[in-house]
Amino acid sequence: MATAGVWFRKCLRLHDNEALVKAVATAKDVVPFFILDPHFDKSKVGVNRFNFLLESLKDLDEQLRARKSRLLVFQGQPEEVFAELFSGKGPCGRLTHLFFEKDTEPYARLRDARVAQLAKDSGVHLETFSGHTLLDVDATVAKPGFKPPISMKSIQNIATAAGPIRAPLDVPKIPPLSVEGFQVPSIGEIYAVEPSSQGFPGGEQEALRRLAQVCADVDYVCRFEKPKTASTGRPKSPWEPSTTGLSPYLKFGCLSVRSAWHAFDQCMRGRSHSQPPQSLHGQILFREMFYLLGAAVPNFDQDQQNSMCKVIPWGNDPELLAAWQEGRTGYPFIDALMRQLNQTGFMHHLGRHAVACFLTRGDLWQNWTAGRDVFDKLLLDSDWAVNNGNWLWLAGVAPFSAPYFRIYDPCPGPKSSLNAEQTGEFVKHYVPELKDMSAKYIYKPWTAPLAEQKKAGCIIGQDYPKPIVDHQKAREANLARFKAALDSGALPEKFGGAKGDPGPMTSFSGGKGGKGDKGGKRAASPDAGGRKRRWGKGAKGDTLAGG
């Protein structure tokens, strides 16, 4: 009698789950399970993201129990877990079939290869499916003539050639499962600190609720242009995301990317709407682009031997990195964003622009890989391909980066492309030392007269740090360093991409090089006729997959 295991990994959902559908169609008995792999320990995963994972597992278990099944949660090395499941020593008899979705991260490839060999040696039928992206990443990269995409135009061409996106799959009728034990652990069993009460509840049901809430406002979906969203949240709540807030749910697969795509498409159908890269479809396409780059480019996560990375002699100062990570640089906007990240696991994409630029080419001249590691641990929506792609982009070292001389001002004014609210409420929420500081000085408190500082109960240099660097001096020095590196041959041997294809621009697109971050106009090309475009029309702009 066939017993099929469904290994939940990055598709923590019942809807649009091809592995689950195939398992139900193949075997009378189906065992849904998740493995808490010690590879992803506390040194690599922050408490907020781990809590989101556990909440997602609990939600999945609740939905399965409502169908008289359940989720088994095993803890240990995957190979050791499967050795028992394949031999019949596990709690549910011997697995004869194993189904799961593909994972293209480097560690996952090695892990899955070992599991596949173990399955083969044990006579277990194994089948994998592409469930975390619109495109089958490996199949796309393997096609003759494939070139790594470095712009919206190139990823649109690849996606269009792949054909229409299939509709999401319905939840199948899952057979009952009666096995005791192997419960979802509590966060307190793993971490000594409590997760934030702010942020996002994990789970498929919450993901679908949020998607429905977003799509209920059809005008919002049609008008969405990510560069125009506020980095400091909605007007009524400066710390509430001004974007969809769906990125953590896509990261964990609580929400199918196909479901999101088709839901947005339904809203836009027959209406004038924004276009990629600024649109919601554009956000998904950039995610696809980074997944393809991560799979196709060797050492995509490194600053050496990476064809997508200019070789820059970055500094290595642990004190500067720690000040940035902990939100004590003396620049309130930067510090508020980093404290938001530490407390909630979330940061708006323009905030990510600001802090990444500040750490690297803008002010502190630290290696982008150090910032990448901080984001990788703390972000709820941290995703290997997307995180590396964005840091390459924002550090100015990738072929799809903006010109390196376009640097964000860490003290954003009302005309800044960082779209920061000017009342200071966001800063005051996350940097309470400045809660009584006048809005006039909130982004540059060191310029406030001493009387103002005393009135606010915050003496700069005592109650809140002085700026860790002088922005203007650091900016000029870093521009000279970057130019010198380029002049000395920092360009890798091969960047790839088509001649004349500029790649995605940041929110500076269209502006001439110069001081500040004013930039130029952002292009938009709405489909005024309301005609449906499968992949959308390309346009310059900026985006960040996540946030």
Regions found by a protein language model. Name each.
Residues 9-11, 35-37, 76, 103-105, ...:
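An acidic- and aromatic-residue-enriched active-site/binding cleft used to recognize and process polar
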Residues 1-69, 483, 493, 503:
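N-terminal beta-strand-loop-alpha-helix module at the start
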Residues 46-47, 74-79, 83, 101-106, ...:
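Conserved short loop/turn motifs at secondary-structure junctions
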Residues 145-308, 421, 425-531, 536, ...:
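Glycine/tryptophan-enriched, flexible segments
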Residues 16-19, 111-112, 367, 371:
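Residues at alpha-helix caps and immediate loop-helix transition turns in enzyme cores, especially N-
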Residues 70, 78-209, 389-394, 398, ...:
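Beta-rich, aromatic/charged-enriched effector core domains that present basic-aromatic interfaces
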Residues 239-433, 439:
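Active-site-proximal binding-pocket segments
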